[in-house]
């Protein structure tokens, strides 16, 4: 592509409503140094570490309004069901947390950038690399969960977030997940 610097890689998602040769642009990953002539293995655990936390039941916080989000498995409002006066998970814009819904709206992935609490219906992960583009990452993760039809299946979440190698082929300026 003319005018595109080599260090930029365009990321495209295959849309199931269009022909497989058509892709939607979702963003650019800057400064990605990668050999574009071969298939690469990418492991989720190379980029994220699981965050251990004590889950809080919704009923214990619903009647205690406040400024801290309570993250659940909803697909709406960045996964936030309500706000309370309690938080037990530290997050910030410079140190964000990724939440992945286990059930309910299974597979939805969100970025949490403020201190919050969460129930047991989500899994939390922290990026190992601060340069990772989290917006694109969330789009790619949600797309992968939908592709394998993830729902109510803990072994699948474990496979996707720890054991599974994504085959990634970089061809000129786009990435395709097999």
Predicted regions, residues:
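Short, tandemly repeated low-complexity microdomains enriched for cysteine and small residues
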Residues: 8, 86, 112, 149-157
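Extended intrinsically disordered, low-complexity coil regions enriched in Ser, Thr, Gly, Ala
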Residues: 35, 46-50, 131-136, 152-157, ...
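A short beta-sheet element
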Residues: 82-140
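Non-catalytic DNA-recognition/assembly elements of restriction-modification systems
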Residues: 1-78, 168-178
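Catalytic core segments in nucleotide and nucleic-acid processing enzymes
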Residues: 146
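Exposed alpha-helical structural elements
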Residues: 8, 43, 134-136, 140, ...
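A generic structural signal for short, non-catalytic loop/turn and secondary-structure boundary residues
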Residues: 4, 37, 63-64, 91-93, ...
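A short glycine-rich beta-alpha junction/loop motif
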Residues: 1-4, 116-123, 151-176
